Amino acid sequence: MRTLLIDNYDSFTFNLFHLLGEVNGDEPVVVRNDELSWSELTPLAVDNIVISPGPGRPEHARDVGVSLDVLQRSELPVLGVCLGHQALAHITGGAVEHAPEVMHGRLSPIDHDGRGLFAGIPQGFAAVRYHSLVVGALPAELRVTAWTLDDVVMGIEHRTRPLWGVQFHPESILTEHGRTLLRNFRDLTRAQGPPAARG
């Protein structure tokens, strides 16, 4: 299985690259967010897409580049991490707002719904957070899948399309069960069937 990894110019992309390679058995195809257009991405032979963390805000096109097109138009499963998670909320009409507290390498216990990305992961697992923005009110097509003890949204899922987002960093060495989460994304991709059979 091969993942297209959209790099939003973030140092954590390197960690994602290695962990996805281990989980999938194939190295991801890495493309910077301003390197290729949507029409240039679509011929790539990949099974799913991960949108990396990055600096900036999801409503600023220069910060997320082609990530917004991916979220709007892709029929492949997509996982957004941190900025990618916020971009999923933004593109569907959700609110992205200042966090109650800026998180810079902080560990937080995360609770979740136990399904999808979080299948087989214990409640209260520790995850690393680097963010000053959070997802707020969500549109009807998204639902919350994970949260902190003070109810900050940590995971979202589209109700009808194969789109997921996590605010924390599963690729960090300090995040518990990050490998399991990415394996779950791989398995969710397999459950969708081959690209030609989707839609």
Labelled PLM ranges:
Residues M1-L5, T160:
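Glycine/serine-rich loop-strand microenvironments at binding/catalytic pocket rims
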Residues L20-V23, V144, P170, L182:
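Residues in and immediately flanking transmembrane alpha helices
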Residues L16, R62-D63, A140, H177-L181:
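Residues at alpha-helix caps and immediate loop-helix transition turns in enzyme cores, especially N-
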Residues I173-G199:
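Acyltransferase
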Residues G65-R73, P77-V81, Q86-E176, L188:
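Pocket-forming structural segment of enzyme catalytic cores
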Residues N8:
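Acidic di-acidic motifs
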Residues R2-T3, S11, N15-G80, T92, ...:
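Flexible gly/pro-rich beta->alpha loop and the following alpha-helix that scaffold active-site loops
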